[in-house]
Amino acid sequence: MRVLSVGSEIYPLVKTGGLADVMGALPAALSSEGITVRSLVPGYPAVTAALDRAESVLRIPDLFGGAAEIRAAAAGRHDLFVLDAPHLYARPGNPYIASNGVDWSDNAQRFAALCRAGALLARGAVGGFVPDLLHAHDWQAGLVPAYLHYEGHAAPPCVFTVHNLAFQGWFPAHLLGALGLPASAFVIDGVEYFGGIGFLKAGLQFADAITTVSPRYATEIATQDGGMGLDGLLRKRGSAVHGILNGLDTATWNPATDEHLAARYDVANLAARAVNKRAVQARMGLAPDPRALLFGVVSRLAGQKGIDLIIEALPVLDALGAQLAVLGTGETGIEASLREAVAARPGRVAAIIGFEESLSHLIQGGADAILVPSRFEPCGLTQLAAQRYGAIPVVSLVGGLVDTVIDANPVAISAGVATGIQFGPVSEAGLSDGLRRTAALYADPDKWSRMQRNAMALDVSWTEPARNYAALYRSLTSR
């Protein structure tokens, strides 16, 4: 089976979140299921610089204000189609936001262009590649099935994956014609969404099947509280919606081979984690205290991620004699609050505002516990990496965190299956209770090490998710 995957980022070439990890890891996992994936991504500077053996396979004379071409290329393990459109993608900043922190004003055209290219490829516009199935990811690719629907050409079945329902790609209605959509599309059963054009809504409306990245999140987004205005449509789609857990790239995330660690280890050599703990403390300016319970945070610094709750709970961390190491970037108010916390608690709280791949691995390999107090979490990869590395995840009772962490309640402790701590409600009080439970377990080395071994024994790879995606693909192509 040949699959065309369309998305706006792919690890390791360009990444702002979990979408890139999935786009980067799922194709290799699907190859074990006999499925060949080619991924279409925008030609950002970081992407075009990484290409090997790029060949122009389709020229587009005018694509939203300029000439473009689709190039077939390899980049590491990835088999790519790259939409080379310098007038849309050759810019500084990240894929969606300029260096001043403001969204690019032409994001509608930039990602409609990606969708146009995806629709062309889906219809077999490039000789030698006719996909059996289209897999579009998030709002940036949401118009692909819409274009195919309104253009009326024969097309392969489409799977549309929602990685985060909060990012919906809403744009003003006056752009309808400029985006190449007919007036008939501007209806409730089309692309119209709250008086504008909804890219994500279009994907949900026209895909043959919808997936999201955990079973729990699939349930949550069909409710009024979790649906963010789209719950009615999701309930209407009913059995077309599937929750398939994300996996983790276990070749990249492997404590036994990880070159970012000060000391590599496996489940039989957990004592080596102490070397990494000292390295985290030294790197981040924390007191070199081997006994202190070290909490790590590797996250986007945003309200969704509950970072403000961690700041509110700092007095509890003080009372526990714990340390906190934070790595991430995000909302300016949260960044400022973290800087204040660091200044008020030297040697006990540390934060590096930014992102360093090597440090993210070191924190997973050296922290005793990883905090993930999200207000909502479609799947989450941080807790998967934490368990892989024997760092106990402390997570809120939402989304994929529920599906991937086994709470250390008395039954799970007695059965010897606990892998982390879940807390609720998602509040400062709920998190504080989770912190105290974590400290109590940390004070019992036998229970703690058993939890670490349980966590590291979990299969968090892409093997099972790939099987589930393959089964869904086959169910659609066999109709």
Curated annotation (Swiss-Prot):
Q: What class of enzyme is it?
A: transferase
Q: What is this protein called?
A: Glycogen synthase
Q: In which pathway does it act?
A: Glycan biosynthesis; glycogen biosynthesis
Q: Which GO annotations describe the biological process of this protein?
A: glycogen biosynthetic process
Q: What keywords does the record list, in alphabetical order? A: Glycogen biosynthesis, Glycosyltransferase, Transferase
Q: Which reaction does it catalyse?
A: [(1->4)-alpha-D-glucosyl](n) + ADP-alpha-D-glucose = [(1->4)-alpha-D-glucosyl](n+1) + ADP + H(+)
Residues where ADP-alpha-D-glucose binds: K15
Report the GO terms under cellular component. cytosol
- State if Glycosyltransferase is listed as a keyword: yes
What's an example of a GO molecular-function annotation for this chain? alpha-1,4-glucan glucosyltransferase (UDP-glucose donor) activity
Do you know which CDD domains this protein is assigned to? GT5_Glycogen_synthase_DULL1-like
Record-stated family: Belongs to the glycosyltransferase 1 family. Bacterial/plant glycogen synthase subfamily.
Q: What is the lineage of its organism?
A: Bacteria, Pseudomonadati, Pseudomonadota, Alphaproteobacteria, Acetobacterales
Q: What does this protein do?
A: Synthesizes alpha-1,4-glucan chains using ADP-glucose.
User: InterPro entries of this UniProt entry?
Assistant: Glyco_trans_1, GS/SS, Starch_synth_cat_dom
Q: Name one Pfam family in it.
A: Glyco_transf_5
Reply yes or no: does the keyword Transferase apply: yes
Q: Which EC numbers does the record give? A: 2.4.1.21
